[in-house]
C-alpha cells in the first residue's frame, strides 16, 4: 500500500512531518505536492493517484481541511473525510472505507497529525453492514 500525500503552501510543513513519520513507520509514501498550486489542484493530484492505484490511501493537508474535503467528495467514487482526531480517522476507514482524509494545519498540531495519519493508514474496512452506506456514497458522486 502506498500513502499519497498532498498539501498546499499552508499545509506543507505539517505534510513534511507526516511524511517523515510514515516513512519511519515503514510505509511507502508518494508526495504529489506542487507547492505553488492551490489546494484544489493538489487535492485533485492526490485523487488521481488514488484512482490509479486502488490499494493506496491519501492524505491532503491545507490550512483547515474543509476545502480539500469538498474537492475530494466531488470526484466519482472517492470517499473522503475531514478529520481532526485519531478515532475519526480510524473509524472512517473501518465504517466508510474512506480512501482519503483531509486535515488542517491550523487545526491540528504535529503530534496529533501523526496519530491521525497512523490511525487512518492502519485502519481496515469492516465491510458487512457498512457496505450498504459505501454503495450509497458511490452512487451519489
From Swiss-Prot:
This is Galactose-6-phosphate isomerase subunit LacA. Pathway: Carbohydrate metabolism; D-galactose 6-phosphate degradation; D-tagatose 6-phosphate from D-galactose 6-phosphate: step 1/1. NCBIfam families: lacA, PRK08621.1, PRK12613.1, rpiB_lacA_lacB. Heteromultimeric protein consisting of LacA and LacB. It catalyses: aldehydo-D-galactose 6-phosphate = keto-D-tagatose 6-phosphate. The gene is lacA. One of its GO terms (molecular function) is galactose-6-phosphate isomerase activity. It is an enzyme of class 5 (isomerase). Its EC number is 5.3.1.26.
Amino acid at each position: 500500500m502506498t500513502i499519497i500525500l498532498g498539501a498546499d503552501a499552508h499545509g506543507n510543513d505539517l505534510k513534511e512531518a507526516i511524511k517523515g513519520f510514515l516513512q519511519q513507520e515503514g510505509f511507502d509514501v508518494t508526495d504529489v505536492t506542487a507547492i505553488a498550486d492551490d489546494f484544489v489542484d493538489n487535492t485533485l493530484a492526490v485523487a488521481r493517484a488514488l484512482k490509479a492505484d486502488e490499494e493506496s490511501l491519501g492524505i491532503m493537508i491545507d490550512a483547515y481541511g474543509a476545502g480539500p474535503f469538498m474537492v475530494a467528495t466531488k470526484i466519482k467514487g472517492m470517499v473522503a473525510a475531514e478529520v481532526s482526531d485519531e478515532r475519526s480517522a480510524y473509524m472512517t476507514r473501518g465504517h466508510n472505507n474512506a480512501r482519503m482524509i483531509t486535515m488542517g494545519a491550523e487545526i491540528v498540531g504535529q503530534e496529533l497529525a501523526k496519530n491521525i495519519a497512523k490511525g487512518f493508514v492502519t485502519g481496515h474496512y469492516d465491510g458487512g453492514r457498512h457496505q450498504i452506506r459505501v454503495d450509497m456514497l458511490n452512487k451519489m458522486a
